[in-house]
Amino acid sequence: MLVLEINKELRRSYALVERNFNLIKRYLGWEVVFMVYTVVNTLTIAFIGLSPDGSGQDKVLYLVVGALLWGFLSVLFHEVAESVQWERWEGTIEYSFMAPMRRLTYLGGVCLFAAAYGAIRTVIVMFAVVSIFDLDLGSANLFAGLFVLLLSSLSFIGVGLMAATLPLMSAEKGSQAAHILEAAILLVSGVYYDVSVLPAWMQKLSLISPATYTLRAAREALLNGASLREIGSELLILLATGVILIPLGLFVFNRAELYAMRTGKLKRSG
């Protein structure tokens, strides 16, 4: 009986993933625009590391790793955090919340789609960058880098769930507030520079950002070929952060949903 119930919930989550990919097909033109922008933006960042004589491959790789990782994590954050805003705009949020499914199933489907969508975009951008730059990944531990990416997804899903409550609390400004949170994480996490260059008080803030440990571990794995054991401390921090943030995100989301229902804030806006 339990197996059947789990299978039913998984199928419902998959239905949400399928629905979101169908929405991408519906707005395919915009997806192409966003993808071109992402590729050009990543290439622009990578060219910063090059010297006029063509040297600086290490700097380019450092920047590319940061750009690719941040691209994946930001997509993960965006898709989870803006799922409520998107459904409100589509006029389907009340139907989704009234559907006979557990809230965990609904949010699980959103998170699965975000992870799959983010991975696809990251792979496309990576191939575009590799086709332009002659990057040497011979010493990279790709398995460890992928493991870091998967583990860090847990933390960002938790943060995204909490950020998804902002559009519930404020239909007009909630989405913009989520962008402010994303910008703060970008600033203190050392995406394009080492956190040691930050002012002392910002370095303290970087310690509470899961992206800091993601970038540190991934760069060690991809630039220096570090093994899972060598980046074990960062992996443990990411695991602990994910274990804490996902239940916390679910709790905060449920509380915000009850508030939105009580105050009538689930109606379409825009």
Regions found by a protein language model. Name each.
Residues 1-270:
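Hydrophobic transmembrane alpha-helices and immediately adjacent juxtamembrane helices
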